Each structure stands twice: as structure tokens, then as C-alpha cells.
Amino acid sequence: MNNTRVSFRSTKSLLAAIIATSMMTWSVNRATLQTTKATEAASTGWATQGGTTGGAKAASAKIYAVKNISEFKAALNGTDTDPKIIQVTGAIDISGGKAYTSFDDQKARSQISVPSNTTIIGIGSNGKFTNGSLVIKGVSNVILRNLYIETPVDVAPHYEEGDGWNAEWDAAVIDNSTRVWVDHVTISDGSFTDDKYTTKNGEKYVQHDGALDIKKGSDYVTISSSRFELHDKTILIGHSDSNGSQDSGKLRVTFHNNVFDRVTERTPRVRFGSIHAYNNVYLGDVKNSVYPYLYSFGLGTSGTILSESNSFTLSNLKSIDGKNPECSIVKQFNSKVFSDNGSLVNGSSTTKLDTCAVTAYKPTLPYKYSAQTMTSSLASSINSNAGYGKL
């Protein structure tokens, strides 16, 4: 009799604990919609093709508010593709406060996969990620808005003979994915800038890779009103000269109303893709002691770029190979297909950028857009309104 009573009480206690835990998890994750911006769809650029809505159709049970990595992972719910809105209300340390100890450890814990039909949006200026990467891989219909992502620091860079130390891990990755909108996102080296690198075996111990990679047949992507700052190898579109079978005809990306501030190169560098960049602001200095400006547009194998009404404020530009100093903005690797209309270089209207490539790029774009005439006041407005906390 006593044993039965004890067993009954134990079962009852266990059931109560399970119910309490379930209720606690539910109350932590489920939330009301804190901003109608979370239900907006991409309105211009390549991401409009087919429609990029993210989690706009999320049921009330799939709307979350998260403030730490445990809550964030629970809200993502693995590969669940039901529409979901994840509102980030605090600074999320992807490492969970536990330092990475090796390459394998960092790979296992720092790469956070984002499923299809998801909107991740920061609330106010609280939505931040450090010590990891947001990985959009093999999915479609994803929106990132109003977020700050600090570029991860590789704890175990690998050495390549003739090329020195190289790092893995980007702040964000779009890999074999379609219909992605990145809006009002800031990506920066933040608290660990490149001047903090040490040396190892007599060479610079590089611990940053890219800010954003778009690769492996990804398509229909728009990057808008975002800020990329304090970084070296910023945006790579198309990861390999030998990946044409997957990339050709894809990697179509629009950049508009973004700011690239004190970044060295790759804004972007493109292989195989078709890039449309309009009304962006580029700020840099060839003589910057930490992030010296090299170039903005990198034309890799079969890459094409249309530049319209952008603003370049770049100090100490130099003539390269006898060309106008402005031509350092466009670096030719294995492609020369490029056109520019109406951009300003150091405040002056110029058509000289068009002389920096051999073949003009005159695409027929399937979406509507309005490239505003670039002026100093427009450049200032774009600079003031780009990045997280400005939505």
C-alpha cells in the first residue's frame, strides 16, 4: 500500500514537472508580434522574383521572442519549414558563453542553420549575434532584418604554404538557397579588429574570413539598407572558378542603399553571378592603417556588374597600370563586363568608371526599381539610415 502510494506520488510529481517545464518553454518562446516590419516582404531587387516573404504567414504559435542561444535554437526548431517569425530581443552569444576549444568544436557549435520560410528580426537595437554564423543553406524564402552580426573569430586558423594563415567562418552564409532578403543588417569585426592579430611562425595570424558569402547556385537575393564596416574580405559571390555548372545563370543579387565603411575589398567580388548595385555608399582610405582600401567591385570568372548612382568617397586613390585613379574601384580578375551610370567619385559626377572595363553590361532587369540621382545629401541620408537599429 505504501509502495503504491509512493509510486503514485512519484508519478504525479513527475507529471507536474513535465507540465511545468512545458509551460515554461511555451511562455519563453511564444510571443506576440512586436513589430509589423516582421511581416513585410522584399519589395525590390532580385529577391522579389517568386516573392520573398519569410515567416509573414506564421501562425500565432510560430511567433517567438528570444534573447539567448538556447531560446533561439528552440525557435528555429531544426529543419521545421513552417513559416515562423523570430524576434531577437537581446544580444545572443552563439557560443553560449563557452569558448571554442578547437576547429571541430567551433564547427559543431558556431554554425546556426536557418530553415525555409523564416524571418529573423531584431527588436529596436537589441538584436545582436556574436561568436557564430547564421547559415542559410539548401533552403528558400528567408529574411534577416535589423540585426547586428559580429564577424566570428576563428580559434584554429589553417596554414597554407605560400598563402599564410587562413580563417574559416563568415558572419552569414547563403549557400544553395533562393529568395533571401537581408535588410538593415550590420556586419562588423566589432570588438576584434584586424589590428589585434598576432603573429605565428613569423606570419600574420589571420582569424577572420568573410562577412557574407553567397555561393553554390544561390539565387534571387537582395541586400538592402545594410552596413558592412571594419572588415577585409567582405562579400564573396561565387566561391570557385570551377563551379560554373552550378552557378551559371544564377547568383543574381541586388545591392541598394547599403553602406560599405572602412572595408578593404570585395563589395562584392563575383564569379558567374549578375550583380545590380544602385544607390550604395562606399567610404574608405587607401592609407587606412587597419583596413586599407583596395577595391570595391571585383570581376571574377564570368561575373557581371551594373553600377548605378552610387557614391564613392575614397581617399588617396592611385593610378594603376596607367588607368585613371577611379579605375581602382573596379578590379578585373577574369572578367571585364561592367557598366556604371551616374555614380559620384569623391563628390564629382563621372563617366570614367565605364572606361575601366572592356565590355559594357546592359542587362534587362525583371523588377521595378528607382535609382535616385546621387547627391551628397542622398549619400548622407543613406549613411544615416543603413544598418541595424534604423528600421
From Swiss-Prot:
Could you tell me the keywords of this UniProt record? Calcium, Lyase, Metal-binding, Secreted, Signal
Q: Which cofactor does it need?
A: Ca(2+)
Cellular component annotations (GO), alphabetically ordered: extracellular region
Active-site residues, Swiss-Prot/TrEMBL: R266
* SMART domains in the record: Amb_all (SM00656)
Name the family. Answer: Belongs to the polysaccharide lyase 1 family. PLBC subfamily.
Protein name as annotated = Pectate lyase D
**Species of origin:** Dickeya chrysanthemi (Pectobacterium chrysanthemi)
Q: What is the lineage of its organism?
A: Bacteria, Pseudomonadati, Pseudomonadota, Gammaproteobacteria, Enterobacterales
Give the encoding gene's name. pelD
